[in-house]
Amino acid sequence: MIWDTDSIIQAYAQGYFLMSDEEGTLGWYTSSQRTLIPLDDRFRYPKSLQRVLNQERFTVAINRDFPAVCWGCANRETTWISHELIEIYLQLNQAGWAFSFETWQGNQLAGGILGIAIRGAFIGESMFYNIPDGSKVAMVKLVEHLRARGFVLFDAQLQNPHLARFGSYGISDREYKLLLRKALSSKCHLI
């Protein structure tokens, strides 16, 4: 099935995001409380991760293997990423909206973050790892990249304990929409 890319991006630009339910039915969602990854000095990570970063075991790439990142994010016991949603991500990637921010160890995909970039907003859809610390390093390097590119917003959608380790925080839907509007007025490009 071909989805209308413009309509999908327009919905994301209004604060909605796609998820599949337990039966695989795709739907649009929003949240009264939105989770953000800080792009300022509130961003933090464990000291043990600094040692991993200093070892430079991982290299970073964008869209080197976008489909593998999609499947890596979906490959869980319970997942909200259906086959149909992967097809949408692939379509958005072809149109220049969806990206994978990846870490590699040699020729092996270590981890990655799947997201949608609309001007100054990066909407993180999911992340995964194949090698320990792969997704954590991807998070640090993605935040550095977004800062360098002038991004205003890193939307993580829903809070979880893993994101809290990076200083993630919640804001109201009203605050989110104001920040999203500001981000959409910025002219940023992920690549």
UniProtKB/Swiss-Prot annotation:
Any GO BP: protein catabolic process
Catalytically driven reaction(s): N-terminal L-lysyl-[protein] + L-leucyl-tRNA(Leu) = N-terminal L-leucyl-L-lysyl-[protein] + tRNA(Leu) + H(+); N-terminal L-arginyl-[protein] + L-leucyl-tRNA(Leu) = N-terminal L-leucyl-L-arginyl-[protein] + tRNA(Leu) + H(+); L-phenylalanyl-tRNA(Phe) + an N-terminal L-alpha-aminoacyl-[protein] = an N-terminal L-phenylalanyl-L-alpha-aminoacyl-[protein] + tRNA(Phe)
Gene Ontology molecular functions: leucyl-tRNA--protein transferase activity
Localization annotation: Cytoplasm
Pfam family, one: Leu_Phe_trans
Assigned keywords, A-Z: Acyltransferase, Cytoplasm, Transferase
EC identifiers of the protein: 2.3.2.6
Keyword field contains Acyltransferase: yes
Domain of life the protein comes from: Bacteria
Cellular component annotations (GO), alphabetically ordered: cytoplasm
Transmembrane segments: none
PANTHER family (alphabetical): LEUCYL/PHENYLALANYL-TRNA--PROTEIN TRANSFERASE (PTHR30098), LEUCYL_PHENYLALANYL-TRNA--PROTEIN TRANSFERASE (PTHR30098:SF2)
Stated family: Belongs to the L/F-transferase family.
Function text: Functions in the N-end rule pathway of protein degradation where it conjugates Leu, Phe and, less efficiently, Met from aminoacyl-tRNAs to the N-termini of proteins containing an N-terminal arginine or lysine.
Protein name according to UniProt: Leucyl/phenylalanyl-tRNA--protein transferase
